[in-house]
Amino acid sequence: SSDLSACFILSVDDSMESILNWYREEGFIFKGGSGAGLNISRIRSSKELLSSGGTASGPVSFMRGADASAGTIKSGGATRRAAKMVVLDIDHPDIEEFIETKAREEDKIRALRDAGFDMDLGGRDIVSVQYQNANNSVRVSDAFMTAVEQGQPFGLTSRTEPGKVLDTVDAKELFGKIAQAAWECADPGLQYDDTINAWHTTPNSGRINASNPCSEYMSLDNSSCNLASLNLLKFLDEDDHFDVGRFTKAVELVITAMDISICFADFPTEAICETTRNFRQLGIGYANLGALLMALGLGYDSDGGRALAAAITSLMTGVSYRRSAELAAIVGPYAGYAENTEPHQAVMIKHRDANRQVHPLHDNDTTVLTAAKAEWDKVVKLGRTNGFRNAQASVLAPTGTIGFMMDCDTTGIEPDFSLVKFKKMVGGGSMQIVNQTVPRALKNLGYTPEQAEKIIAYISDNGSVVGAPVLDEAHYEVFDCAMGTRFIAPMGHVRMMAAV
């Protein structure tokens, strides 16, 4: 047996023993090439006293030790970089320090680089900069977001005396600091606590406090998830119709195999082993969505693109839970199901109802959505009879590493980065390659091979479709990418995340 999970959620309490155990557990997880996330909000703030009478260090200071440990293990011969997620609740008294931590370190990097130090990624001097080995996220509540909208004050509360307000801040100003820091250094991210827990299948066993490093897996503390992703482009048939039957069979097979794998897996701690065996969380997902949409002649930031993405995601999750209910009929539901029967079934009904809000626009999404509707009806019906084998079934991972092994043009739910890429050659130099999805897209949009050849030659020379001969301007949106002359607007990315 071996450790088959790549994603873990840990926990840490307000004690030195727990904090040092956090370092230890992360160390062993990183050594195995996996990643972990946790919420550090239970640790008392730097504005509170210790039992001995001194002032506490606060959670941000303890992040420094964990960050250094991750950086050391990463450089000690591990096969991949340590992956960390650190989460802090919006009402923690040290939240402002947490928000600005990485942005301040970025300022140091620029200053040291200008002074002549080697601050490039992997440079000899970059190791002296702190907080470079983790993703940081702020857990925001509905109450905080309402305060932001209404320009109201927001209370930061004690960890040692729950409910006691230690400081009051301007919610809109604090949100502005989050946005500014994210603009400067891409951190912190946001995790919407109330929404996350509203879709939680096992709330009677504990709330969701944190995520794995990439944020796709959100579940109980001290839990794990094994991931598997499907290459969506491989499910287009010869006529470029999405093959619902093959996709359904693939999801059934992978979910079954993933559930079996839990029985044979090792885990880094006893607590994680117990939680995973009791709740059997799985994480099937997909990659190459951006390439799929382009190949079909659908803009990433278009209603048609979002409709198909939503339909495929719904079908995948519906098939996953339906197979989970079928497995439960044979080998029994997960051990924690009895305690969470009502909330788990309620979340399945929410999924079914949400699926009904998706409106198809083309043949492909109509076919997929019809299948998804049938699957969700089965999920609700079978779940009432059999229960479920797994507390969770699907996630949408970024597939940043495995996507390339799977021959994907795009990773996770991302659009294509650019229409033209440069491939480094073994003997030196580079070769320019036009995105391989472009010819397929032009064919589906009705262009002849001769017209397509002219358009591709133009893209190769100019890196953009703008002004390409014979290309209808109405089709420009199909070729919009993350970068370039016609880059996808920020809300285009947000709308796609909302759709899936």
Annotate each language-model stretch with its function.
Residues S75, L233-L236, F267, A295-G299, ...:
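General structural signal for alpha-helix termini and helix-helix connectors
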Residues V251-A287, A291-S324, G428-E473:
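Helical catalytic core of nucleic-acid polymerases
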Residues S5-K249, I260-T275, L298, A309, ...:
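Active-site cavity-forming subdomains of large catalytic enzyme subunits
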Residues T101-K102, D193-I196, P203-R207, D303-A309, ...:
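Composition- and surface-driven signal marking solvent-exposed, interaction-prone regions
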